[in-house]
A protein has these predicted regions:
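Feature activates predominantly on carbohydrate-active enzymes
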Residues: 45-55, 59-61, 88-287, 293-297, ...
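Aromatic, loop-rich ligand-recognition surfaces of beta-strand-rich domains
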Residues: 608-673, 686-734
Length: 734
């Protein structure tokens, strides 16, 4: 018995020694006591492998102080890392990490696989984590020995893009394994390209038949579409495309896609017939793209499934080299796309496209574009949505964030999106915690609690989350006064926790700006607000946005400094006499739609509208406005003004003119004056006081406001051929 035990122990000890010897021989000793023991071998040598080698050497040196030599086409020895050999274990951008006799081989499945293999090695085995531009963590060590490694990985999507100011940092962009459309599409033509290919300024006057027929007439314009059944359009497009590919021989993909705008597709008899045959507007577009794909079989053509082309055709299937860029712009974001009505409409379209194509590019929207510096708690939707895209044959994915500082928790959202685009099976909540602990350090528990409270309050409120939202939409829900007080307490504690670390403190303060902006927006709708307290909040917001270089508050480049200046002018109380304040209004021509319900109060309530039309503003669509104000008694005044909004992206343009008239009895009217507008094609949101002043005061009880609109959107506009809006709010009589 004792003898058997000794034999058993002998064999166990022998096995352990052999196992230890195996693992020791399989290990890759890179650095010992701060001295390089291994080399980096590029095999073969090319720009991608050179970049991968440089990245590895850079971070090994930051960890250990040792600089690994980079050599080419050398025979590997123990301790070396070989970068760039090909592998069949991974697909495009994928990689394999394989230990072999003390040598680690980082193999590529194609494209940037070797770079991403280096990133995986640094993250998983050397403990380096990159969070945002110039922000990473590592643990210094004079010794680096790699264990035996055998793994392979391929991304879920062959193309992965999101926006962040971090993309300006070349290490960040590679670390997040991100790509850019300009690397793929010829001449950077990747979306809304009709007018780039056949400009209306060049062809529109002589050949209006090339462009959409809308409401019975041809409408050439920057945002009009092509008449896709016109054979001359096809031949001209082919000539232009051929010249572009000849000028960019390194590219094989181009977008041939509708101009931005809704409903501007051609409705001529020939195009209408195709639409009826296909059961969808997209049928005409896919037929056209298939003809291009047949003319250029070695090229790939991307086209939009966006707004009026979102639903797939019933008959025609896209050819394999036709890429469908499907956009979910109209969906609400408070829950995953499968869980609300607007999302389910998109999901139905996605499933329809996935039945007829394996070449789908998803364009997803993950921020509030009307107020990027506004809370947008959709983190719980990211993983299920990206998994949905993957299940339905999407091979390319663009998660549209905003790349500017101050965008709501941009750093965390961009980081999480990058991780999930590579592998959508990861747990989003775990990713959030990992990011917060590394980026916000000791402030992480408070900001995590803030995000969870915000998310819970959004869901409990039942209010949808829209990508063109206003904080005012949520002032009774997730941004009510009680919750905002709690949010501020959490931020106060977060700031206190990192007060000794200026860099981390500034990250917390930058992330607080959306809450501060929301409170300012909500405060301006409260006639009983604390004016001095609001002024102090505005001053702090002004100071912090300047400090952190916040460039814009929305996608239309409205700058924070302009917002603060206008806020002081429009929303902070000043002592001025307004005879129209609170006075009743009678409409001769009522506002459009829902605006008729509250317009009579909103025009004289003393509360100015903000940079989005969804609150305080009163609108008329495609027709003129006419209303009277009863001042209550005969008054003396010399100035009348009305406040107008320009928001071109929402089809809200300046009207032609506004005319003011006065009367004692509301029957006989005398002209007071007319203000004539100048056309403005800017995408920036603007306000304009249409003021008329007379040299001598007049006496009257009634003031009439008559606004002449422009009728239809002009040829340069997104809504060419469709009714234009104009919006106004406060009318003042002084």
């Amino acid at each position: 018995m004792v003898k058997n035990m000794k034999i058993k122990h002998f064999f166990i000890l022998t096995f352990l020694l052999l196992l230890s010897s195996f693992f020791a021989s399989a290990q890759t000793p890179l650095v010992k006591n701060g001295k390089a023991k291994g080399r980096i071998i590029c095999s073969p040598q090319n720009t991608v492998n050179d970049e991968a080698a440089s990245l590895l050497r850079q971070f090994v040196e930051r960890i250990s102080g040792a600089s690994l030599p980079i050599v080419h086409q050398a025979n590997p020895r123990k301790g070396d890392i070989v970068i760039g050999e090909s592998t069949t274990r991974a697909g495009e951008d994928g990689f394999a990490l394989e230990s072999d006799g003390g040598v680690l081989r980082i193999k590529s499945g194609g494209d940037r696989g070797s770079i991403y293999g280096v990133v995986e090695l640094l993250e998983r085995y050397l403990g380096v984590t990159y969070y945002a531009k110039d922000v990473y963590t590592l643990t210094p060590s004079a010794d680096i020995t790699l264990p035996h490694i055998d793994m392979a990985d391929t991304p879920a999507f062959r193309f992965r893009q999101t926006f962040s100011y971090g993309n300006d940092d070349p290490v960040y962009r590679r670390w997040m394994r991100l790509e850019s459309h300009d690397e793929l599409f010829a001449a950077d033509m990747w979306v809304h390209t009709f007018n780039q290919l056949l400009p209306a300024e060049v062809y529109g006057k002589a050949h209006p038949e090339y462009y959409s027929m809308i409401n019975g007439r041809r409408q050439p314009g920057n945002h009009s579409q092509w008449c896709l059944t016109n054979p001359e359009v096809f031949e001209l497009a082919c000539q232009k495309i051929d010249s572009i590919f000849r000028a960019h021989p390194d590219k094989h993909m181009i977008s041939v896609s509708q101009n931005d705008g809704n409903g501007t597709y051609c409705q001529c008899p020939a195009c209408k017939k195709v639409e009826e045959e296909e059961g969808a507007v997209s049928g005409n577009y896919i037929r056209f793209l298939n003809r291009l794909a047949q003319r250029f079989p070695d090229k790939e053509f991307s086209t939009l499934a966006y707004l009026f082309t979102m639903d797939p055709p019933h008959l025609t299937k896209p050819l394999p080299n036709v890429n469908i860029m499907l956009c979910d712009i109209d969906c609400k974001r408070e829950v995953p796309l499968t869980d609300n009505e607007s999302g389910r409409h998109f999901v139905k379209a996605l499933e329809g496209w996935s039945r007829i194509s394996d070449n789908i590019f998803i364009w997803d929207y993950v921020i509030n574009f009307d107020g990027v510096v506004t809370p947008f708690p959709n983190f719980h939707c990211l993983q299920p949505n990206i998994s949905l895209f993957k299940r339905n044959h999407a091979t390319m994915l663009f998660e549209q964030n905003m790349p500017t500082r101050g965008t709501d928790f941009l750093e965390m959202k961009a980081w999480m999106l990058a991780k999930l685009m590579w592998n959508p099976q990861q747990d989003a909540d775990s990713l959030m915690l990992q990011f917060m602990r590394g980026y916000y350090r000791e402030a992480a528990p408070y900001l995590y609690q803030y995000q969870k409270l915000l998310q819970g309050a959004l869901l409990a409120s039942g209010t949808p989350l829209w990508i063109y939202d206003s904080p005012i939409t949520h002032k009774q829900g997730m941004l009510n006064a009680t919750l905002c007080k709690t949010y501020n307490q959490l931020f106060d504690r977060a700031e206190e926790a990192v007060r000794a670390d200026t860099a981390v403190l500034n990250r917390v303060r930058l992330s607080r700006l959306p809450l501060q902006y929301s409170e300012l927006e909500i405060a301006r709708t409260n006639p009983n607000r604390d004016a001095e307290g609001t002024r102090q909040q505005l001053d702090l917001f002004d100071e912090r946005t300047r400090q952190f270089g916040v460039r814009t508050l929305n996608e239309r480049d409205n700058r924070p400094e302009d917002y603060c200046r206008l806020y002081r002018q429009r929303f902070l109380p000043v002592s001025e006499r307004n005879l129209a304040l609170g006075r009743p209004i009678t409409f001769i021509s009522e506002p459009s739609g829902r605006y008729a319900d509250f317009g009579a109060n909103a025009l004289t309530d003393g509360l100015y509208g903000g940079t989005t039309y969804v609150e305080s503003w009163v609108g008329w669509e495609g027709r003129d406005a006419d209303f009277t104000i009863d001042l209550g008694s005969t008054e003396s005044f010399s100035e009348v003004t009305a406040d107008f909004l320009l928001q071109s992206g929402a089809w809200i343009l300046w009207p032609q003119s506004v005319t003011y008239s006065v009367s004692d009895d509301a029957r006989e009217w005398c002209p007071f004056g007319t203000y004539t507008f100048t056309e403005d094609r800017s995408l920036t949101v603007k306000f304009l006081d249409a003021t008329v002043t007379v040299p001598q005061p007049v006496s009257a009880r009634y003031v009439r406001v008559s606004v002449k609109g422009i009728g239809q959107c002009p040829s340069w506009h997104y809504g060419v051929g469709y009714p234009a809006w104009f919006f106004l709010d406060e009318v003042k009589v002084r």
